[in-house]
Amino acid sequence: HAKFVLKQVARKTDLIAATRLCPGTDLYLKTENLQVTGSFKVRGAYYKISQLSAEERAKGVIACSAGNHAQGVALAATRMGIKSVVCMPDGAPIMKVESTKRLGAEVELVKGTYDDAHDRAVELQEQTGMTFIHPYDDELVIAGQGTIGLEILDQLPDVDAVIVPIGGGGLISGVAFAIKSLRPEVKIYGVQAAGAPSMEHAFHDHKYETLDSAVTFADGIAVKTPGETTFDMVSQYVDEIVTVSEDEIAAAILALMENQKLVAEGAGATPVAAALFGKLPLAGKKTVCLISGGNIDVNILSRVITRGLVMSGRKTNLMIALEDKPGQLSLVSDIVS
């Protein structure tokens, strides 16, 4: 049903071969960075809001997001003539904040992290009676995200493995459920930023837990607390979860730009980072990396490119203390050359 409903708004994004990206691996990219609003999030948000009653629609919807879910909710609500309010952490990329406003939502910036924005959204929901559209821990949202899994099976029927970014777990829950229901032998791998490994910890420790902090430039997956529903689904349907460092994410973003001419945000590049740096057993497997979004702030992108160049050995930063006397710059150039 979600697949039918989403035909009205979501694109069936391309699945492209990435032969140059990771030599020796049969790699494909599911380009949700080219989705409406630049992210997969519109799928879950639109499907959830489309199922609201007339009474719920009249009261409006409220959400919390670091950016991509915000844009999905704003677009869906505006398309259906419904009022939307979105609480966003004050550190959210300006591009995502402004885009959310342009799409018709009222934005409230909340000091702190995503979790602080979530608490504020719940508070407002209790005060106003608006329907809270959870970014990941909701069965209808998960069903919307799961349509990506159906598309992957349609586009690459003999797929062996799919690598998916994880923040709160909504995307991988939907994709894993959809694929495993039809092709249980397909491996589903999750990837988190090493600085925000909430689901990775929960998965390997077999218990639901909250991190003290979630620090990563991949703002789309900087989540301290995974969803309860998503944790249960991940535990049941996901084969393994790994983490990647900030440098590895930066290198993956750069590799996608140079080799595939694709712009991915930090979260969206994590599956490619896992493939590039040998985090998973992919030899001999037709593997799909799900590029979840491409909404990266240009200032962050500039720093990421520099970081990626350093990571790949093509740029070096030097700090040299010199005496204040003639001939020092000549000495430095002689040493460097």
Where are these regions (language model features)?
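PLP-dependent amino-acid enzyme catalytic core
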Residues: 1-337
